[in-house]
């Protein structure tokens, strides 16, 4: 690509690392004596530190949400369509922070990191994490950057769950919550999909109980299958039909079980292959468990409105009509609970053919609604 970046891009960005040496107590009962978080920033923090926006990523996301790491990069960050000058999260107004979560595999301390107690990768010995644990770790990052209160915490899917948890755990630190394509907890069906994905990894002979790094291998097949299952749930039936239909890769059937015959088979195998080369299997297990465990209403006997009684943020909840992983009905559960708790909330349900992945795709109505809300935030 050209060395000149698009006018609405944040341009060249450099990841940074923050190290924390104060122990972090975790929900599982264990603690991390120290940890590192990799993050990027876009825009400029104003003198009163009142214009900061935190981006929380989804299951396979990371800190590189916008811009480019090099002039030769083929693609920008994963949410570049939403972050930059004149975009919904306008870097002419906001100072944006995007991080790789604790337990991740893109530089932050996680299963592939070296355990200082053993000198070997944590592997399966890395503690199980929850959404609350992530929020607690993110608070420290904000403080390190001089941010005591976020103008907004924003996220899609698992990122939206983090944004919601922020308003519950630290109500005084968040003015606005933008929760996109999310849910107040996983359904039994969603937990089931996660379990199938985990079993694909756990039963891969190359997993070695999570110590595959010590063996110099990766559970490639398990990761491929996990990603293939997950990817099906991110797309709608209509979008898969439109994109692939029943199209064949060649003009005839092979009448065997090993050939890649349909275009959709080729797509899924490509996605699985690509994912298995860049993602850590233990991190995948951790992320899916954090999803499964998320249930903030459990502290009040399942009453989400009671859980939200003390929150002070304003909320923007968005969903997409063809998202069956986290359907609009799940977003409306959050909206209904906020209304019952007499909180300020706006809700936008967007017609989109793209399923759960719609929160990553810049369709006009989505961009307009997102921009309209963010532009209302006083800084």
UniProtKB/Swiss-Prot annotation:
It catalyses: L-homoserine + succinyl-CoA = O-succinyl-L-homoserine + CoA. GO terms for molecular function: homoserine O-acetyltransferase activity; homoserine O-succinyltransferase activity. The record marks 325 as: Important for acyl-CoA specificity. Substrate binds at residues 227, 357. Residues 51-360 form the AB hydrolase-1 domain. It is found in: Cytoplasm. One of its GO terms (cellular component) is cytoplasm. It holds the Pfam family Abhydrolase_1. Pathway: Amino-acid biosynthesis; L-methionine biosynthesis via de novo pathway; O-succinyl-L-homoserine from L-homoserine: step 1/1. It comes from the Bacteria. Requires MetW for activity. The active site is at residues 157, 323, 356. Coiled coil: none annotated. Keywords: Acyltransferase, Amino-acid biosynthesis, Cytoplasm, Methionine biosynthesis, Transferase. GO terms for biological process: homoserine metabolic process; methionine biosynthetic process. Its EC number is 2.3.1.46. Belongs to the AB hydrolase superfamily. MetX family. Transfers a succinyl group from succinyl-CoA to L-homoserine, forming succinyl-L-homoserine. Homodimer. This is Homoserine O-succinyltransferase. It comes from Pseudomonas putida (strain ATCC 47054 / DSM 6125 / CFBP 8728 / NCIMB 11950 / KT2440). The gene is metXS.
């Amino acid at each position: 690509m050209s060395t000149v970046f698009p006018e609405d891009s944040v341009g060249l960005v450099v990841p940074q690392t923050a190290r924390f040496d104060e122990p972090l107590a975790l929900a599982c009962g264990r603690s991390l004596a120290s940890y590192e978080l990799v993050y990027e920033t876009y825009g400029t923090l104003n003198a009163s530190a009142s214009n900061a926006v935190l981006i929380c990523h989804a299951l396979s996301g990371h800190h590189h949400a916008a811009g480019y790491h090099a002039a030769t990069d083929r693609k920008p960050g994963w949410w570049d369509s939403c972050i930059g000058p004149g975009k919904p999260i306008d870097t002419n107004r906001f100072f944006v922070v995007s991080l790789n979560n604790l337990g991740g595999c893109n530089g932050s301390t996680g299963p592939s990191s070296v355990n200082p107690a053993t000198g070997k990768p944590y592997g399966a010995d890395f503690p199980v994490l929850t959404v609350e644990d992530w929020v607690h770790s993110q608070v420290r990052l904000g403080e390190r950057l001089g941010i005591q209160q976020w103008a907004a915490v924003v996220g899609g899917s698992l990122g939206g769950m983090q944004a919601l948890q922020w308003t519950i755990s630290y109500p005084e630190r968040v003015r606005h919550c933008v929760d996109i394509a999310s849910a107040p907890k996983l359904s039994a069906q969603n937990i089931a999909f996660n379990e199938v994905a985990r079993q694909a990894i756990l039963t891969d002979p190359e997993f070695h109980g999570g110590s595959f790094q010590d063996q110099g291998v990766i559970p490639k097949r398990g990761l491929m299958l996990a990603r293939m299952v997950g990817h099906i749930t991110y797309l709608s039936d209509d979008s898969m039909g439109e994109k692939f239909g029943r199209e064949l890769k060649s003009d005839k059937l092979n009448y065997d079980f090993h050939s890649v015959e349909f275009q959709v088979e080729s797509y899924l195998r490509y996605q699985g292959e690509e994912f298995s080369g860049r993602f850590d299997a233990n991190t995948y297990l951790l992320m899916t468990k954090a999803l499964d465990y998320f249930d903030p209403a459990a502290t009040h006997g399942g009453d989400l409105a009671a859980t939200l009684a003390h929150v002070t943020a304003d909320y923007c909840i968005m969903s997409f009509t063809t998202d069956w992983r986290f359907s609009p009905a799940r977003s409306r559960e959050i909206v209904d609970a906020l209304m019952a708790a007499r909180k300020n909330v706006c809700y936008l349900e967007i017609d989109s053919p793209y399923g759960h992945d719609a929160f990553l795709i810049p369709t006009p109505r989505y961009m307009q609604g997102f921009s309209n809300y963010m532009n209302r935030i006083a800084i």
